[in-house]
Each structure stands twice: as C-alpha cells, then as structure tokens.
C-alpha cells in the first residue's frame, strides 16, 4: 500500500482467498481490513478455494471494480497448507507449501475489460478432501488417530487426503479446455 502511495481510505474492497482461514468465525477478510487500517466502508469477502483461487478472486475483484463505484481493491491470497498434511504422508509434502500474494487493482476509466473463464465441477470432491473437522463431520477422537489409509499412507481424518492421479487427470483435461473456451469467447486463435 505504501509502495503504491495509496491512501488506505481509498481502498474500497478487500478479498481474501484461502482454504486455511484464521478462524471459522469471523471472516479473515474482516480481520485483515482491521489489521491493515482500512476504513469500515471497505467491502470484504472471503473465498474458500485452492488452486483456482487467485483467478476466481481476481475475477470477483475486477467485477466489483468494473463499474467504477469502487476505485481500488486488494486481492490477498494465502494458505498454510503444510498444517493440513500429515508429516508421515509422503504423497503430500512434495506438492504443497505455504505462500501468500497481494494484488492491488485500480479502476481506470476507459481501461480494457478483464476477461475470465471460470467453471466449477464438484463431482471430484473426493479426490482432494479433508474428511473431518468442519460441520458435516466434526472433530472426534477418531479424527485425531493417525492410521494407514486405503492408499497405504499414514494420515488422520483431519489431514488432506488426495488422489494425486485423479487431481492430475482433472488438471490436464480441464485446464486446456478452459483456456480454449476463453480464447474462443474472445475470438483469439489458439495459435496466437
């Protein structure tokens, strides 16, 4: 904010994307609004997404800014996914880490629109899931036990369970189609 020479009172929106929020309640975006010293008129929103989270967050932020009612917005994306994996799960550690980004977006009259292709397919939820710890399956003594899972790896029901092949297959089949759909929508040849 300082490097941009932005007045904190001009920031009208803060979106926080994470699957590892500070608390169940309140929303982390509200806490960040306060910690950053943004005014109480700042629109805040939490989005719970992983890999696609930055793109989804940017699409929401750009939509909020597109009419010029909000002039400046922040997109904060961060996860501490190392806390979600079991230290004994050798399939998890090479793929996940802790990271965060901050993206500042400003409305400029006459600037080009931002275009996105977003889609959702919840049918593969079992391919990457933390079975216990939320409201469908709360925390119990059974949740804490580290056991050998059906895939032969050690983890508790509070750790991320991932079918790497299913996640990989999803990524390599869906991502290219999403890019192609966006290019088609914008009438840009794929060769370009």
What are these regions (language model features)?
Residues 19-73:
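Conserved catalytic cysteine-centered active-site region
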């Amino acid at each position: 904010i300082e490097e941009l020479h932005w007045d904190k009172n001009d920031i009208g929106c803060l979106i926080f994307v994470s699957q590892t929020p500070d608390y169940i309640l309140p929303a982390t975006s509200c806490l960040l609004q306060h910690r950053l010293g943004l005014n109480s008129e700042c629109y805040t929103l939490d989005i719970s997404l992983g890999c696609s989270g930055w793109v989804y967050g940017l699409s929401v932020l750009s939509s909020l800014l597109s009419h010029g009612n909000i002039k400046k917005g922040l997109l904060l994306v961060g996860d501490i996914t190392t806390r979600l994996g079991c230290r004994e799960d050798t399939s998890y550690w090479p793929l996940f880490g802790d990271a965060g980004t901050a993206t500042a977006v400003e409305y400029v009259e006459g600037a080009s629109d931002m275009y996105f292709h977003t889609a959702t397919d919840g049918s593969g939820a079992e391919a990457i899931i933390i079975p216990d710890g939320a409201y469908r399956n709360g925390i119990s003594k059974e949740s804490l036990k580290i056991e050998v899972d059906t895939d032969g790896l050690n983890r508790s029901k509070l750790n991320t369970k991932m079918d790497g092949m299913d996640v990989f297959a999803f990524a390599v089949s869906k991502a290219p189609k999403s890019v192609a759909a966006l290019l088609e929508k914008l009438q840009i040849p794929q060769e370009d």
